[in-house]
Amino acid sequence: KKSGLLGISGVSSDKRDVEEAAAAGNKRAQLASDMLNYQIKKTVGAYIAAMGGVDAIVFTGGIGEHDAIARAKVCHHMDWLGIRIDTEKNEHPVGDVCDITAWGAKVRTLVIATDEELMIARDTKEVVEK
């Protein structure tokens, strides 16, 4: 009940609340945010290595779609893998599919909007029709 973001930050299990507290100077919240972003970055790197490279990285869902700070931290220092994002595009993504790739980067980086309610409705319909 008090693990993960809440356990480390002492603030909340919601990353938005943790980021707000970190921005206000809460060191535990900053640590929690840094640890989560590091774990995401480590996982992305592991998958890139396992696949022998990638053509694109997609950020979607709650954090991926709405957290420019997380996207920036995950992609930071990944230039050597061909990943570099445009700061302005990252901070202000436009449309359901937004390419935030920086000019000259070899790997495309996209932010794609999700419609979780639609997915739940489709899955429910599929189950009911079986």
Q: Regions from the language model: what does each represent?
A:
Residues G4-I8, K15-A50:
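Adenine-nucleotide phosphate-binding core of ATP-dependent small-molecule kinases
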Residues A22, S33, V58-I63, K89, ...:
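Active-site proximal loops enriched in glycine and acidic residues that flank catalytic Cys/His/Asp
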Residues A72-E116:
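Conserved phosphate-binding/catalytic loops in two-lobed NTP-binding clefts
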Residues I8-S13, Y47-D55, I85-E91:
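Flexible, glycine/charged-enriched surface loops at secondary-structure junctions
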Residues D55-H77:
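Glycine-rich phosphate-binding loops at beta-strand->alpha-helix junctions
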Residues T114, I120-K130:
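A charged, well-structured terminal subsegment
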